[in-house]
A protein has these predicted regions:
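Long beta-sheet-rich domains in secretory-pathway and surface-associated proteins
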Residues: 2-186
Length: 186
């Protein structure tokens, strides 16, 4: 996407050599058992290193950045979609709109999984498809400016561990002198 406008400044250029790097992580223990339904808190961090290149003066670029409320290094319009490919999980969370994540910061979202009752113990990777846009560059020339935006889709993974668990089922109970809500030995 390219935005075009007018500005009264000599040629200047901003180029961002590194796009935002989004990294999802589970914020608490990532352990579940077969048959469980669990909601995880997921932090999506923008680990953009802030490596930029400025050409000439900053004045015209600063004006464009301020006018359009641009945050350099930010991932904008971030969305996350979790999938259950190759896992014993049923993903109960739909695609989520996260918003803008500025460089060095993160935003919370959630992931709800239903674990298959016959899930084997082990560590499983849940794919997370992240879509976002970012400012790739700004060119300011006499009377004009160009904002170059790029869109990106990346797939990252969250590790979730299924622990071995014992599930007992009581089929029948026989006892004398038992009634509802009573205490006793069986």
């Amino acid at each position: 996407t390219v935005a075009v406008g007018t500005s009264g400044v000599a040629a200047e250029q901003y180029t961002d050599f590194s796009q935002p790097e989004l990294t999802p992580t589970i914020q608490q223990q990532n352990v579940v058992s077969a048959g469980d339904t669990h909601t995880f808190s997921v932090m999506i961090q923008n680990r953009h290193d802030g490596n930029t290149n400025m050409d000439r003066r900053l004045g015209g670029i600063a004006t464009v950045v301020e006018t359009h409320r641009i945050t350099l290094g930010a991932a904008s319009g971030v969305s996350a979609k979790f999938t259950d490919d190759g896992t014993p999980f049923e993903i109960k969370t739909g695609a989520q709109s996260i918003g803008t994540i500025t460089a060095g910061n993160g935003k919370q979202t959630s992931l709800t999984v239903e674990v298959a009752s016959d899930a084997e113990p082990g560590v499983y990777q849940v794919p997370v498809k992240l879509q976002y846009s970012y400012i790739q560059g700004i060119n300011v020339d006499t009377g004009d400016y160009y904002i170059n935006r790029d869109e990106e889709t990346v797939t990252k993974h969250l590790n979730i561990r299924v622990e071995e668990s014992v599930r007992l089922t009581v089929d029948t109970v026989q006892a004398e002198d038992l009634y509802k809500n009573a205490d006793g030995t069986m």
